[in-house]
Swiss-Prot record:
The active site is at E54. Keywords: Cell projection, Cilium, Cytoplasmic vesicle, Disulfide bond, Fertilization, Flagellum, Secreted, Signal. Expressed in testis and epididymis. Gene3D superfamilies: 1.10.530.10. PANTHER family: LYSOZYME C, LYSOZYME-LIKE PROTEIN 4. This is Lysozyme-like protein 4. GO terms for cellular component: acrosomal vesicle; extracellular space; nucleus; sperm flagellum. It is found in: Secreted; Cytoplasmic vesicle, Secretory vesicle, Acrosome; Cell projection, Cilium, Flagellum. Monomer. Disulfide bonds join C25-C144, C49-C131, C84-C96, C92-C110. It comes from Homo sapiens. Residues 20-146 form the C-type lysozyme domain. GO terms for molecular function: lysozyme activity. InterPro entries: Glyco_hydro_22, Glyco_hydro_22_CS, Glyco_hydro_22_lys, Lysozyme-like_dom_sf.
Amino acid sequence: MKASVVLSLLGYLVVPSGAYILGRCTVAKKLHDGGLDYFEGYSLENWVCLAYFESKFNPMAIYENTREGYTGFGLFQMRGSDWCGDHGRNRCHMSCSALLNPNLEKTIKCAKTIVKGKEGMGAWPTWSRYCQYSDTLARWLDGCKL
């Protein structure tokens, strides 16, 4: 009985092959150092919340949304059809693979471009759904040393 419970719990801890998950405080530090804290008025907590709900802190995440016909790239799941690559508008002027680097430099640069637009962070429906009106945003930085 104990062995099956332990094995079940271990199954939840195993990260799929190829995944590169950053810790919450590591993400917060990189975003802070990249100048996102209060960039265009959005707190660092908002950015960390967005990163969690978009990619679960996986900077190498690629998600193909076949229902809506787009592919999201990186920590913030930026749409290839709008923000990166050779076959779309490429508003961030970079390849989509550049958004998959764990150093997050290009990701932060592109995020700044996106949030300067008329929708702000509302450009990410996930932010509107899970972060915008959250009364627990402070938890995203709990215990983090920036």
